Curated annotation (Swiss-Prot):
This is Glutathione S-transferase alpha-4. Pfam families: GST_C, GST_N. It comes from Rattus norvegicus. Glutathione binds at residues 9, 54-55, 67-68. Residues 3-83 form the GST N-terminal domain. One of its GO terms (cellular component) is mitochondrion. Keywords: Acetylation, Cytoplasm, Transferase. Conjugation of reduced glutathione to a wide number of exogenous and endogenous hydrophobic electrophiles. Homodimer. InterPro entries: Glutathione-S-Trfase_C-like, Glutathione-S-Trfase_C_sf, Glutathione_S-Trfase, Glutathione_S-Trfase_N, GST_alpha, GST_C, GST_superfamily, Thioredoxin-like_sf. Belongs to the GST superfamily. Alpha family. Its main location: cytoplasm.
Length: 222
């Protein structure tokens, strides 16, 4: 029996959420250990589990993986979500890096002072509408397929949907000028494993609240 991947992170989205999305889309069951105390974090460091002293940490296939980008690349390749050749793979990388840049503007916002937080979220919505979503709308139009790369689901599609939903939590009508992205959102959301992940009771995490921010600050001492 294959051992389930184990995820070590806070009980919130942060940099782990995209990893949860990939595993859930691949239909892979996983376990989670939530960091709630400084002692848990220090033990992981003492045991040599954190390569650069940082989480996310994923235990999978007999390995302890850190660094979000490396983990996502490994999972995408392992679960056939990384294209059919090198040219498709580099496009998937470009698109995923773009959506990650957009999402990080939102992920980091709760840790800022109230006014800075609102400014960061407003900037994220503006960038989504003026920089990122026009690009993906054009990609879908030019490619003429149901997916961003090739003719099958990839990491790029999954992470774009994650980004869309995250921006919509800040500004619900953000896709109003992007009909192809609206259709894309509906289409990808209805893939069975993704549809299940989007239902209440899944391992998808809610938007961060004050408690999550306090726990992260306490554990990481910042």
């Amino acid at each position: 029996m294959e051992v389930k991947p184990k995820l070590y992170y806070f009980q919130g989205r942060g940099r782990m959420e995209s990893i949860r999305w990939l595993l859930a889309t691949a239909g892979v069951e996983f376990e989670e250990e939530f960091l709630e105390t400084r002692e848990q974090y220090e033990k992981l460091q003492k045991d040599g589990c954190l390569l650069f002293g940082q989480v996310p940490l994923v235990e999978i296939d007999g390995m302890l993986l850190t660094q979000t980008r490396a983990i996502l690349s490994y999972l995408a390749a392992k679960y056939n979500l990384y294209g059919k050749d090198l040219k498709e793979r580099v496009r998937i990388d470009m698109y995923a890096d773009g959506t990650q840049d957009l999402m990080m503007m939102i992920i980091g916002a709760p840790f800022k002072a109230p006014q800075e937080k609102e400014e960061s979220l407003a900037l994220a919505v503006k960038r989504a509408k003026n920089r990122y979503f026009p690009v993906f709308e054009k990609i879908l139009k030019d490619h003429g397929e149901a997916f961003l790369v090739g003719n099958q689901l990839s990491w790029a599609d999954i992470q774009l949907l994650e980004a869309i939903l995250m921006v919509e939590e800040v500004s619900a009508p953000v896709l109003s000028d992007f009909p192809l992205l609206q259709a894309f959102k509906t289409r990808i959301s209805n893939i069975p494993t993704i549809k299940k992940f989007l239902q209440p009771g899944s391992q998808r995490k809610p938007p961060p609240d004050g408690h999550y921010v306090d726990v992260v600050r306490t554990v990481l001492k910042f």
